[in-house]
């Protein structure tokens, strides 16, 4: 999925990730920043960038992103998404379960709904691509895309 995501990102976009891939081998025009293993920092940086009217994509493991609820709520939802756009693309609700319990999450949908963050769960690559096009047209806000696994 991240390769599909790459083709939709523009030069003005930011892609933040938590040590998910080799940035040098990721073909995108976006400003790509590997924050490392620090999802709290990743969410705070995303909120700051979005607050300056930027479009920020976050790519990370769902379990690690969701468990940083305070940063997600305050930095991203309440601060950054008011003037910019934050799109969280997780690397699999259960797609990384083989790496341990911390890498999977099954309650991300109710958590996003509780936070009033728009939740999407595309099933196929085509649905994922159509969703990216749809979100590109939306105004400022925060959006969460749950992927079953990373198809790339």
Model segments located where?
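Thiamine diphosphate
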Residues: 1-151
């Amino acid at each position: 999925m991240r390769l599909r995501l790459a083709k939709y990102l523009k030069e003005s976009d930011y892609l933040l990730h938590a040590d998910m891939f080799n940035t040098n081998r990721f073909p995108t025009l976006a400003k790509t920043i590997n924050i490392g293993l620090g999802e709290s920092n990743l969410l705070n940086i995303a909120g700051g960038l979005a607050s300056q009217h930027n479009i920020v994509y976050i790519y990370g493991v769902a379990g690690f992103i969701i468990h940083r609820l305070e940063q997600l709520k305050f930095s991203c939802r309440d601060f950054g998404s008011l003037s910019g756009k934050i799109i969280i693309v997780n690397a699999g609700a259960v797609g990384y379960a083989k790496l341990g319990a911390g890498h999977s999450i099954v309650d991300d949908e109710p958590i996003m709904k509780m936070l009033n963050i728009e939740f999407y769960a595309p099933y196929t690559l085509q649905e994922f691509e159509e969703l990216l096009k749809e979100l590109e047209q939306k105004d400022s806000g925060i959006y969460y895309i749950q992927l079953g696994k990373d198809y790339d």
